[in-house]
């Protein structure tokens, strides 16, 4: 017995969505076979924030017959439900009563026991229209010290300069997770980025996402020394001014990596090493920064991020700290007024809801079109961190997040053919995330925190290898060839689903690398893999020319272990991304003419290990595709 759920708002089918603005009235429909003899259907809605053991109950009424099915419906006013995260199930009464909840397929309901398989419903404050400039664009994530060296910036004291740009090995711990000084630099800087803006633009990039650039001791700068200054080894504020000016000429934007959960121990605020003129919290309880930190036994026993002693954790609810970061003349206001367009928030899970709301409000007060991203590794719609449910998408906290769940799903599909995981992840993102948040998702294949995507696709587990071994390990020619083919399939997917693709510098030219720090090597200027680069550039042009990538709806058409097909569409036109991850050729037939977005030629064959992005006109619901193995 197949039972389905559909949802409508003012007659418009919104069945794939499960997150709605509180001002909407949603018409819920349950469709089930007449032969089951249903006499009543009731929705049981459980909400966080509602008194314990209480729920809302909605009785559905029979409204029509569709073929051999009965349709029961109930209009539910989201304003009366209230902003929050909810879960629901249906009770269906026939000659017996049973419950149905979320099925494996989109809009499918299945029998459940107790509260297993409840369906998620999110009610948020209001739809956001921020950062429309991000729609249809591409982000480029730069680890500044390793991108391009201008030679204009002098090293600071206590720094090790590695002058071997192409073959130099970064510092690494004797054992994974061990201590690393992280004071070895290769010399990349903001002036170096300016020199390569034409190259970056050729990828279709519209936004630079910079690793932290505030003054700090380390090469990665996650140990902030001074939030109010740009590190001199990156060119100081003068270089940032020049970068902002040059990016604006090209219609590009910049977002900073904001590290507000912890500072460096070597900083104005903590000053453990005494390298700053300030009175740091480590030096005196009379320090203006003392209350920012949690000392268990002053001064050497203090709370740190993941027990890393050089990263003392701050209390994001401390009022003086909030004033410093979020207040008038504070960190957010200064850099937004300088001309950047937003922040990616490091370890957003560890920042309080109040801090996130205040940050978003301050940022938007300076630039209403600015954006706030959060580093969240799981489903951000229902994340629990430190035993507390986060409220990222209920309104005025995060505009979107880094899409790590989708990265894992792509890898699992492209590398192993796991279509079920890919399908379920697409379903989760569509039904759990408000559309305005999903349209801004940072869709990534790699970051400074992951192995290089090419390495992931081309090799198996390296558990048991030492860092010394990994520092020298590279793929064989056979592994590289296979990884290269898979990478292009993966990028075709990540660049055409809802959200914004984010390229980790060097992925587009075939950079390899295992875990940190080997995923942060210098960019191989002059030694790029032209085949991968040209593919990325082609995708960039397609994203720019096709309007459906600026917020078009998403439909998954085919998803098995060999063939993937999905559409982006609006009322008038659509694109279809077709991926053949198998080693065999497939043909396909379509009732609507489909032409390549790249060549404008009609395509009916999918070569082995290939991806095509096609364009069609008309109603996506009328599109029929059939695939045949040749």
How should each PLM-predicted stretch be described?
Residues 26-34, 577-579:
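Short edge beta-strand/loop segments characteristic of extracellular beta-sandwich folds
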Residues 557-591:
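Carbohydrate-binding surface patches
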Residues 30, 142, 200, 210, ...:
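Conserved, mostly hydrophobic/aromatic
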Residues 137, 143-207, 213-337, 359-366:
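Substrate-binding/active-site clefts of carbohydrate-active enzymes
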Residues 244-253, 261-262, 267-278, 331, ...:
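Active-site-proximal helices and loops of the catalytic beta/alpha 8
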Residues 145, 386-387, 442-475, 491-529:
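Aromatic/acidic polysaccharide-binding cleft in carbohydrate-active enzymes
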Residues 1-27, 50-141, 147-165, 171-173:
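The feature marks proteins involved in alpha-glucan
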Residues 602-630:
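C-terminal beta-strand-rich structural cap/linker in extracellular carbohydrate-active enzymes
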């Amino acid at each position: 017995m197949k039972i389905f759920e559909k949802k409508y708002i003012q007659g418009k089918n919104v069945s794939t969505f499960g997150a709605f603005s509180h001002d909407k009235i949603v018409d819920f429909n349950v469709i089930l076979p007449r032969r089951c003899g249903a006499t009543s259907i009731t929705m049981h809605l459980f909400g966080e924030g509602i008194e314990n053991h209480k729920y809302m109950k909605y009785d559905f009424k029979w409204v029509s017959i569709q073929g051999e099915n009965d349709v029961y419906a109930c209009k539910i006013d989201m304003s009366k439900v209230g902003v929050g995260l909810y879960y629901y199930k249906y009770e269906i009464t026939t000659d017996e009563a049973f419950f149905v909840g979320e099925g494996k397929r989109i809009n499918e309901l299945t029998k459940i026991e107790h509260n297993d398989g409840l369906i998620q419903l999110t009610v948020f404050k209001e739809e956001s229209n921020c950062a429309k400039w991000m729609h249809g664009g591409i982000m480029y994530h730069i680890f500044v010290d390793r991108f391009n060296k201008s030679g204009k910036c002098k090293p600071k004291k206590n720094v090790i300069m590695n002058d071997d740009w192409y073959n130099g090995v970064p510092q690494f711990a004797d054992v994974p997770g061990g201590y690393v000084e992280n004071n070895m630099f290769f010399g990349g800087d903001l002036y170096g980025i300016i020199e390569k803006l034409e190259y970056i633009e050729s990828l279709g990039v519209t936004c630079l996402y910079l690793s932290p650039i505030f003054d700090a001791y380390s090469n990665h700068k996650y140990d902030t020394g001074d939030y109010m200054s740009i590190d001199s080894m990156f060119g100081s504020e003068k270089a940032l001014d020049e970068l902002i000016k040059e990016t604006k000429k090209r219609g590009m934007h910049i977002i900073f990596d904001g590290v507000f959960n912890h500072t460096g121990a070597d900083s104005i605020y903590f000053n453990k090493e005494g390298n700053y003129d300030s009175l740091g919290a480590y030096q005196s309880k009379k320090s203006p920064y003392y209350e920012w930190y949690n000392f268990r036994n002053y001064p050497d026993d203090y709370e740190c991020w993941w027990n890393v002693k050089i990263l003392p954790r701050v209390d994001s609810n401390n009022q003086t700290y909030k004033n410093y970061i979020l207040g008038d003349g504070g960190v957010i206001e200064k850099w937004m007024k300088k001309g950047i367009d937003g922040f990616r928030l490091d370890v957003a899970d560890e920042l309080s809801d109040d801090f996130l709301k205040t940050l978003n409000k301050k940022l938007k007060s300076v630039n209403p079109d600015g954006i706030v991203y959060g580093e969240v590794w799981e489903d951000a719609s229902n994340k629990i961190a430190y035993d507390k449910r986060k409220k990222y998408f209920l309104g005025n906290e995060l505009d979107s997040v880094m899409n790590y769940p989708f990265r894992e799903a792509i890898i699992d599909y492209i590398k192993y053919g796991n279509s079920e995981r890919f399908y379920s992840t697409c379903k989760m993102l569509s039904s759990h995330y408000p559309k305005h948040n999903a349209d801004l998702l940072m869709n990534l294949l790699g970051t400074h925190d992951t192995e290089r995507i090419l390495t992931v696709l081309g090799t198996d587990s390296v558990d048991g290898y030492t860092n010394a071994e990994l520092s020298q390990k590279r793929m064989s020619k056979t592994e590289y060839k296979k990884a290269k083919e898979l990478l292009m399939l993966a990028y075709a997917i990540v660049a055409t689903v809802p959200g914004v693709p984010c390229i980790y510098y060097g992925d587009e030219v075939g950079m390899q690398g295992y875990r940190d720090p080997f995923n942060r090597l210098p960019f191989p200027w002059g030694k790029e893999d032209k085949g991968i680069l040209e593919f990325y550039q082609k995708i960039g042009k397609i994203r720019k020319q096709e309007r459906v990538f600026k917020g078009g709806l998403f439909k998954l058409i085919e998803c098995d272990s060999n063939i993937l097909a999905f559409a982006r569409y609006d009322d008038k036109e659509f694109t279809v991304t077709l991926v053949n991850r198998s080693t065999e050729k497939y043909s396909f037939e379509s009732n609507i003419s489909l032409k390549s977005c790249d060549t404008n030629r009609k395509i009916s064959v999918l070569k082995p290990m290939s991806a095509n992005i096609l364009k069609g006109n008309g109603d996506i619901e009328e599109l029929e595709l059939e695939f045949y193995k040749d």
